[in-house]
Amino acid sequence: LASGSKLLPELRCCLELPYIERTSTMTAQEKIEEIKQRARKNFSLGYNCAECVTESVLSLIDTGLPSEVKKLATGFGGGIGLYGDTCGALVGAVMAVSAVHGRSSLPEGEGKEAAMKSKEQLYGKPGLYRLFNQIPNRFKAQNGHTLCRELTDKWQETWLCRDHALFCRELITGAAGIAAELILSDKDESASKPFGENVENLKE
């Protein structure tokens, strides 16, 4: 940087101290709020909805994954390349939680034994599907829908207007909060909760 150059506040804070180190002494609630505010700022910097959430979480939470994994979020913006499917912010939240609580390999074992262990890991109590099922259910409870086209229907003819951008910024902030809460809460407790919509009648 040239002498005397000025940085935007959000860029200055990131260069003064490594982000994870800077937030290492925060309480869980402070980290959740920091993640939400970073996601919010990301939108004004030019990140799309999915990128905003994944970048904010993965910049604070040390997953051991390379920073390049953030690139995986790009195509999900606007409900997958503006297709209007699942909201990009919601997908970003799922990706962020997966980066921490997802599976990198199957359980040890062979044949039917391995398959049964895998099924239990997903469907059991605790089970990963119980944890991830909370993300879309919480998002829908907050916003009424999970599909981009339904959330943004009133702006289909004025997609790039300010009101639409402000609306999506709130979705992004909320989705980042959902992801952060699930990551920073007790995993087994979160993964033992009842299923929500779609499989709410699945036997315990």
Where are these regions (language model features)?
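Amphipathic alpha-helical interface segments
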Residues: A50, E55-L60, V94-V97, E110-K203
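Short, basic, low-complexity termini and linkers enriched in Ser/Thr/Gly/Pro
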Residues: A2-S3
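Small-residue-enriched, tightly packed secondary-structure blocks
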Residues: F43, Y47-H101
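Polybasic, low-complexity association/targeting segments
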Residues: M26-L45
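Juxtamembrane membrane-interface segments at transmembrane alpha-helix termini
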Residues: R103-E108
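Short, Lys/Arg-enriched N-terminal segments with co-localized hydrophobic residues
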Residues: E10-T25
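Active-site-adjacent bridging/hinge elements
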Residues: T27, P66-V69, E150-T152
